[in-house]
């Protein structure tokens, strides 16, 4: 298949690498001003969890090809920072590039709002289980064995089976939640609870260090569980039935102290999970989700004292810096 990736970010490039290794053609859609600086190849260091649950370290290269104006693709992957979906669609349309869209995005939007941005484009909402960073032409990333994927009945694409075939060809399984939008909101709420706890002293400039300290501290993880219990109330207030997401929320329903100890053991014994926690260092992207949850909770008049207190210390120390 011919797969396009908007931009050259970590998530899109990680999955592009996996698809290219599976025999598919991959192309990057870049803005005109970035085309000249695009590399011909990227060095890849991957902790690959697709075949080995503990992960397998791999070193390889990824060949970079560029999409041209007017091209048509089997699928186009869009993975952009929160709030930037509209600009992403404008970039694709300005190049007259066509194909069904795979949305690998954090967004706090309602489905109707996203569809207003997309217009008549075919699309499916999904969520990656990968992460990392690109620096000096080297991609250092983690790839799990599955993605979260909207069900065929809710996806707005004409060939859902082709998408499943693409994913299977790259050994990427699919987990299908009740509703992909609500699942993303829950994911953002959980992350907001974790982030607000890790940075509860008010400093968030070094996410890598904060993640390492949090994962090794069962008492801090206990606080995180309590914060998550607050933040998921925001998703419930938006109309989501949390009973439909028992698997996602079960770890936060057991006694917080026990959950904190269990989470510390999980991080210590699972390199895939612990490494992905430390590789995400984009403060603006991290804070986007936190701010969405905070603002929604305030708007709805919810009592979330632990979460609000942590976030307000962070906001104070950010001292008006631009977040998104």
Residue ranges and their predicted role:
Residues 1-55:
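NAD(P)+-binding Rossmann beta1-loop-alpha1 motif at the extreme N-terminus of oxidoreductases
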Residues 110-189:
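Rossmann-fold dinucleotide-binding core
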Residues 138-148, 201-213, 269-280:
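Helix-loop-beta segment of a Rossmann-like dinucleotide-binding subdomain
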